[in-house]
C-alpha cells in the first residue's frame, strides 16, 4: 500500500516538474528568438572597417561576433521586442562592435593591452556609447582576454564548430568555468538554428539571474564553482528532457524566472 502511495506521489511530482519545464521552455524559446533576431543586426556591420578578416574562416568570425554580442549582455540593456528599423534600440549597439574590434586586434597582435585599448575606443566613441558602456568592465576585459588566447577548432564537416571542443579550449584558457567563456557557446548555437545539436557535455552559462531562477524552483542557490556548474547542467538537461526542448530554452527560461530582462 505504501509502495503504491509513493509511486503516486512520484508521478505527481514528475507531472508537476514536466509542467514547470514546459513553461520554462516556452518562455525561453521566445526570449531566444529575440536574441537570435538581435544577432542578425551584425549583418549591417561593415567588417572591413573593423579589422582584416578576409583570411579568417567565416565560422570563426561568426563565433567571435557571438563573443562580442554576449559580452554586450553585461550592459544589462533589455533587448528590443519590436522591429523598428529607424529606432536606435533596434540597431546594433556600438559597444559590441568595439568589443569585436578589440578582440580581433588582440588576436592579431595589434594591441597588447586589452583594457587600455577598450577604454580608448569607448572614449573615442563617447557620444555613441553614452549610457551604453559596460557596467562590468573587468568581466568584459576578462572575457576578451580569454577568447584572444583561445585557438578555435577547425570547422567540421557539417560547416559548424564543435561546441564541446570549443568549450574545452575556452575553459583551459580561463582556468575554470566562467560565464564569459560559456555564454558565447549559447549565442553561437542559437544563431545556428533549432536543428543545431548541442552536446550534453556543454555547460549552460549561469549568471545571477539564472542562479536566482534555480533557487526559486529548487530552493538552493548556485555559484560559479565547477561543481555548481555541473549540478546546473544536470538540472538543465533533466528539464530539457521533460519538455523535449534544448538546454538553451531552459537556460533562458530560468533567466527570465530569475528576473532577467
Whereabouts are the PLM-identified features?
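HhH-family (HhH-GPD) DNA N-glycosylase catalytic core used in base-excision repair
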Residues: 1-261
Amino acid at each position: 500500500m505504501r509502495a503504491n502511495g509513493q509511486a503516486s506521489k512520484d508521478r505527481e511530482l514528475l507531472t508537476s516538474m514536466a509542467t514547470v519545464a514546459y513553461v520554462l521552455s516556452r518562455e525561453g524559446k521566445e526570449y531566444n528568438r529575440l536574441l537570435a533576431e538581435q544577432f542578425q543586426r551584425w549583418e549591417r556591420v561593415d567588417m572591413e572597417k573593423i579589422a582584416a578578416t578576409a583570411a579568417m574562416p567565416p565560422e570563426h568570425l561568426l563565433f567571435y561576433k557571438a563573443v562580442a554580442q554576449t559580452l554586450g549582455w553585461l550592459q544589462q540593456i533589455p533587448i528590443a521586442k519590436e522591429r523598428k528599423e529607424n529606432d536606435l534600440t533596434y540597431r546594433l549597439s556600438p559597444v559590441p562592435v568595439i568589443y569585436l574590434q578589440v578582440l580581433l586586434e588582440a588576436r592579431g597582435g595589434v594591441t597588447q593591452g586589452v583594457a587600455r585599448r577598450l577604454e580608448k575606443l569607448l572614449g573615442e566613441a563617447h557620444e555613441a556609447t553614452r549610457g551604453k558602456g559596460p557596467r562590468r568592465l573587468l568581466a568584459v576585459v576578462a572575457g576578451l582576454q580569454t577568447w584572444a588566447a583561445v585557438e578555435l577548432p577547425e570547422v567540421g564537416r557539417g560547416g559548424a564548430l564543435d561546441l564541446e571542443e570549443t568549450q574545452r579550449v575556452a575553459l583551459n584558457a580561463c582556468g575554470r568555468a566562467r560565464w564569459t567563456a560559456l555564454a558565447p557557446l549559447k549565442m553561437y548555437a542559437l544563431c545556428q538554428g533549432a536543428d543545431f545539436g548541442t552536446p550534453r557535455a556543454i555547460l549552460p552559462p549561469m549568471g545571477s539571474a539564472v542562479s536566482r531562477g534555480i533557487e526559486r524552483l529548487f530552493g538552493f542557490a548556485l555559484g560559479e564553482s565547477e561543481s555548481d556548474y555541473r549540478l546546473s547542467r544536470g538540472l538543465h538537461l533533466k528539464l530539457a528532457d521533460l519538455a523535449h526542448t534544448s538546454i538553451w530554452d531552459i537556460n533562458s527560461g530560468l533567466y527570465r524566472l530569475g528576473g532577467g530582462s
